[in-house]
Amino acid sequence: MGRIKNNNKGLSLVFIDREETEGTMMLYIRNEKETDYKLVEDITRKAFYNMYIPGCVEHYLVHIMRGHEDFIPELDFVLELDGKVIGNIMYTKAELTDEEGSKKEIVTFGPVSVLPEYQRNGYGKMLIEHSLNRAAELGYEAVVIFGSPSNYVSSGFKCCKKYNVCVEKGKYPAAMLVKELKPGVLDGRIWFYSDSPVMSIDEGKAQEFDDSLEKMEKRWMPGQEEFYIMSQSFVE
């Protein structure tokens, strides 16, 4: 069982009792520092390589995101386990527009990354829940993300159609999930979602960036087909 202490600087200190080994793990969630940049990009690369496509682009997105006007540094967190950075989460601003043209600034997160050898231990969920709490403290009222529902419903995300949040042509992607940070804030209207331009990745530049790094083997994985099916699916 973890015991969490928070302060007003966006830092969490978590003590997790080991059940099968001696001692106690100390886990910090803190804002990313400039000295973390290359390490975080490497963590992201290792976490996503061959997950959705042969190779990945998420580490390049991290690389360019920090310099974009929609990046939110206050919601840029890393997770340290016993002094070692093993995961991170980053946020950008996004926008909802209702049928009358009224706009609402919201947030989206991603990538959220954990080193492969530390995955499926709840660390990603810790990053998500810590950052969502901080986003609410900063006054943001809703979060829209794209991802596998099984990874996010336990953190309170629901199908976008339940909140009448759609993309162009009024479609409701199965992978688009919504969480209200202010209950009822999306009630009574149909919303069209737009993410930040930084999310439109130049695949050529992403490949050049990947080629500049230590070589990793690109290969096909069964999960890539699952991702394709989910990304092409819509809720009626």
Task: State the predicted function of each range.
Residues 137-141, 147-171:
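Conserved active-site alpha-helix within GNAT-family acetyltransferase domains
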Residues 27-40:
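A short beta-loop-alpha structural element at the N-terminal edge
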Residues 41, 48-96:
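Active-site rim helix/loop that mediates acceptor-substrate recognition in acyltransferases
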Residues 7-25:
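Short, Lys/Arg-enriched N-terminal segments with co-localized hydrophobic residues
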Residues 94-108, 119:
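A conserved beta-turn-beta hairpin within the catalytic core of GNAT-like acetyltransferases
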